[in-house]
Structures are given as C-alpha cells and as structure tokens.
Amino acid sequence: MTTLVSALKEPQGLWMNGGAVAYATLGYILGFAGLFHESLVVNAASTLLLAHSMTIAAYLIHECGHNLVFKRSRHNAALGRAMSWLCGAAYGTYEDMRYKHFRHHVDNDDVVWFEYDEFFGKHPVLTRAVKFLEWFYIPAHDLIMHFIMVFTSFIIPQRRDQRRRNVTVILIRGGVFLLLLVYFPKVAVLYAIAYMLMMHVLRFMDMLQHDYPYNATLFEYKDPPHKGDAKWEQEHTFSNPVSLRYP
C-alpha cells in the first residue's frame, strides 16, 4: 500500500482516482453481467451502470494523459491503456490519443484528420440519414467517427504501421460482440445502447468545454494561428462551474 501511495501524483489520489478506477472496473463487470439477467428492471439498471462506468473510464484516460494519476508517465500510460479497453477506445494507441489531445491544448485548436464538413457536403444522402438518426438520439455522427477509429490502420495512411495491433483488437472485441449477437442478442443490443449513452454524455460535455474551429492538421503540422493566444483560448473555453456561488 505504501508503494502504491508513493507512486501516486497526490496522496488523496488513492481514494479519489482509486475510487474512480474501482468504480469503472466493477461497474463495467457488474453492469455487463446484469445484461444477462431475465429481469427487465435489472437490465435497465445494468445498462445505465455500464454506460456510466464506461464514461468514467473514458475520463480517466484524460486524467492519465495529463499525468494526473501517477507521478511517472509509464504508470499513467498503463492505466490509460487499460481504461481504453473498457470504453472501447483501444483500436488506436494511447499515445495517439494523448498526442492529439495535447495538440489541442498547445495549439489552442481542434486538431483533426477527418474533414467531416467536406465529407458530409459530398454525401448529402448520408447527411440526411445522420440527421434523421440524430433526431431519435442515435449518435450517428459519433458512430461514423468511431468507425474510423475502429478501422484506423485501414483508413488513415499514417497509421498503417499499426495494422497488426489494430486487427488484433478488432478480432478480440468484434469476435466477442459477434458471439453476443448470435447467442445473446438482447445483451448485444443493451451493450450498444449503453455505449451510445456514453457517447451522448461525452459529446455533450465536450461541446461545453471548447468551441474551437477544427483544422485537419493532425499529421501535416502547420503553425497554428492562435498558439499561445490566451484571449482566444478564454473566448473559446467554458469551464464547468462548481456552483453559482463558487464558479
């Protein structure tokens, strides 16, 4: 226990971050197990628990990326990679997620690879389908982004060297989901609902954090126009207030 505490960024992290990790892990296990139950009430509660535990796992990746859990980067990376398996973000690498996120902070920009405005402009039928599905709270836009992440080494040329790893993760996660779909279709559907609930929470919160315009410069670095511009950052950053009294 002493060794673990000494490895943490802050002593209270044992209970704060440790509690979050325990909740995400146990919540995922219990939530997933509850999807197999015969009771619809248990199914509904388990779906919500699973969605919430995956959401916490996703935010823990963010904390690990900023090295806020452990003192050493390699320990944060190990935890971040583990959490990426819980929230379905393991198709790409932890290092890629961290690099993209820090480009966002350093450049004061939304740095991306996929020109989605241009893509939707060229595919009006798909755009109408996405809008239709979004009306029913199916996060179709994010599912397209997730599809790109799942097949990242096949779609993004700069990630072709990750092909073996990418295929391995697809076979493991895709294989398990296919088995669920064939033998336990109810579980597969409820898992998909839980995953989409997580997507809704993450994108709603992200929407409130920043409203930077995006630039497709993830792999083609160009001098960001607002790097170091504190005024620009403040104009496009919205922190969550703790309360109206203590913003």
Residue spans for each PLM region:
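Non-catalytic, topology-defining segments of multipass membrane proteins
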Residues: 1-53, 60, 87-192
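Alpha-helical transmembrane segments and their membrane-interface exit regions
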Residues: 49-57, 196-203
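Cytosolic-biased juxtamembrane loops and peripheral soluble domains of multi-pass membrane proteins
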Residues: 62-78, 100-126, 149-161, 204-245
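Short acidic-hydrophobic sequence patches enriched in Asp/Glu that either
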Residues: 71-78, 93-96, 196-200
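Short cytosolic helices in intracellular loops of multi-pass membrane proteins
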Residues: 80-84
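Aromatic-lined glycan-binding groove of carbohydrate-active enzymes
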Residues: 187, 191-215
